[in-house]
């Protein structure tokens, strides 16, 4: 077993703080509209330029094992905030550093770390309560554009793009970010239910110019069976022919004489039809087919339900305004399902979303939810160079997360003002002893740090700016981009309440851990064994 290094008391805490400071000092130069960028070296390919706190923090590993522990703890603050709220990672890191430094002064002076921790927790609870009171709901497209622009480093173009996408797909819709081949960033909207399966035969095309099959007002047969014998679908084909409407078959596969029959009938003009493979795999396929059935008001014909294909009647088929398919994907537009059934299905998927721990499952459930609720928007990111493309894509993803957070819990004044306005509320925190009061004071002293830093990064004296803002009321604050004092809501300088809340909670959690740490145990680095030189050749 490898030998361990042990460090105790003050020595341990000092090493932790050194590591924490290295990460925080690298990250904090990016805060605010006048924050700088950091260039990250990559082993392969071009370096990455970013001003995203969590991306920078993740790249830092230190040689000293004790210092590295401190660095890893700050990374945890940034990652956790990023996971929960999608933004605010730099603010969280800066707050953690401020809380630790303030707390350390008192712990060294003899305060009991456990009581100090309790005081910090009580103060944070009060601040979170106050933030909820300050927050106002996101009501307009303009609000969304402001939140997204601030998160994307004051890029109004990105802000407007995300606001447009949100407006089109609604708050349950999915917005995906992809890389574009061109240099412009565009927004594409996918209407209705789209899945990645195309037509099974090119003979089914109705629009040769666009290589698409477009069927108006079709009947839709939805099954997870493989159809190869024509006798299985002959009864339903005859019934659909009598209505004069086209037929779409979504099945595990359609092959052999069944497919040949559909093609021949199409070519002869007897029945316009389209056969498509079912999307997904395994249980997910069944769930997606069930979604399609509910969306179109049809019945999912499965082996488990015991309905034979021969016995399918017209009322078991789904209906839609239009189905469009090319060789890669199929889109069902204007499904004619019962609204209540669709809403119940959406509620069911939302419940599953809350209960799942898997990131992959969450993503897939989110996609299914969007397809039922209103569609998918795709933002195609364009840029002149690979490095710029990566950086821009990253900013858009950040802005998207921040926007979703804003829709959930509302917005608060940005630029560090919201935290500053909660300081007065700390007067009401009830404490049991002097050390708990010290914990509350530590939080009080740390709440103006983000605002000071934003001003410092803009080349101003942070302490003076913070004092001026403290003298003002409500949403009044400092606009660092234009060097003026404004109403933050009116100027569009806003943060999602969820981002500010998560940043403080995660920072306080890690700070409390550092302050109550008395010992560190780390692996002793192994010395590299020197290999003897090869024997000389004779």
From Swiss-Prot:
Catalytic activity: ATP + H2O + a folded polypeptide = ADP + phosphate + an unfolded polypeptide
UniProt binding sites for ATP: 30-33, 87-91, 415, 479-481, 495
Cellular compartment(s): Cytoplasm
Keywords from the named record: ATP-binding, Chaperone, Cytoplasm, Isomerase, Nucleotide-binding
Keyword ATP-binding: yes
Keyword rRNA-binding: no
Any GO BP annotation: protein refolding
Leader peptide range in chain numbering: none
Pfam families: Cpn60_TCP1 (PF00118)
Principal location: cytoplasm
First-tier enzyme category under EC: isomerase
Family: Belongs to the chaperonin (HSP60) family.
Role: Together with its co-chaperonin GroES, plays an essential role in assisting protein folding. The GroEL-GroES system forms a nano-cage that allows encapsulation of the non-native substrate proteins and provides a physical environment optimized to promote and accelerate protein folding.
Name of this chain's protein: Chaperonin GroEL
Organism: Dictyoglomus thermophilum (strain ATCC 35947 / DSM 3960 / H-6-12)
Originating gene: groEL
